[in-house]
């Protein structure tokens, strides 16, 4: 699994899980555009079905779209065939909507095991984890989330945030 990318430049990857979640997604897209920042959105398949216009808005804004499973169940609790179904179903939904298949996957809760690795290898998708976690599902104060990220951030870090938790635009803007 990829948890960071070795870089000398002061560059990090902003990633957002669990979307799309209108109206949070739109507010997040506006904030990212104001700051000239692109991000990777790891989308849940059931949200792709429910909010196709938000998925299209994310893609049209130039952000990368990754697969975050269909139902957001922990992959470790699923059979090999159920894992594969979660991956394929979500990738198919995204491809049918956007004309492009996602190439990245982030497991729900960051949990993975040998069965998931086998399924991802079969589908040619890397697992993208994170090494900087804003814990924005526990904390709603944007300043505390931002400080948590900034106290340990380094070039090449992959930062985990969520589309739809708390004041979504504040930590990224800071």
Predicted region positions:
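Catalytic domains of cell-wall/extracellular-matrix polysaccharide-remodeling enzymes
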Residues: 49-50, 73-174
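Active-site beta->alpha N-cap acidic-glycine motif
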Residues: 1-78, 82, 86-93, 98-100, ...
């Amino acid at each position: 699994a990829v948890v960071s990318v070795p870089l000398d430049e002061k560059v990090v990857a902003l990633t957002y899980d669990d979307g799309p979640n209108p109206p949070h997604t739109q507010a997040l897209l506006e904030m990212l555009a104001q700051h000239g920042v692109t991000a990777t959105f790891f989308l849940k398949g059931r949200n792709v079905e429910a909010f196709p216009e938000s998925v299209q808005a994310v893609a049209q804004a130039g952000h990368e779209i990754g697969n975050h499973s269909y139902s957001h169940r922990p992959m470790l609790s699923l059979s090999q065939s159920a894992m594969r179904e979660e991956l394929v179903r979500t990738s198919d939904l995204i491809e049918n909507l956007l004309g492009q298949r996602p190439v990245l996957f982030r497991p729900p809760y960051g949990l993975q095991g040998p069965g998931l690795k086998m399924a991802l290898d079969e589908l040619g998708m890397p697992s993208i984890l994170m090494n900087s976690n804003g814990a924005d599902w526990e904390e709603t104060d944007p300043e505390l989330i931002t400080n948590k990220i900034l106290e340990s951030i380094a070039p090449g870090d992959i930062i985990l945030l969520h589309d739809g938790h708390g004041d979504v635009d504040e930590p990224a803007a800071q």
